[in-house]
């Protein structure tokens, strides 16, 4: 698998964010109110993320420049009910707010929060979004962009791993063999 480029490779090696945490408005639309940098950093990051394997945005960035939902592509010819090919959103970005939502592995989310790079999403705190969904603070400079890039790459890897683990059992798999044996014995 092609992995996104980043010098940061481990969540426990992320530096502590400098300065105070930005102020945010907590609610269903959880947004950052202060401390955001130039949107060029986020726009550049989004452009790169959309080049990663099996990634797309809904709606396409050109039709909705303010709201970008980033997810894994649904496999060609897949049925919507198939767990293995379900669309897996791992990021949502509101460019004008500004706000980034990422669904991270719990350990990564923990370290992002602990080191001052994010806060738990309001709806995740109430069980209405997946655990590990955070509001990472938008990057103010190049060094912060690298940390934000790391968090996007972890969200991407987590989404890919989640989809791979949820593959449904097929009719020829050993898990279903007992069903067929029962049907044969009962005459069904």
Task: Label every PLM stretch briefly.
Residues 1-188:
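Charge-dense, helix-prone N-terminal extensions
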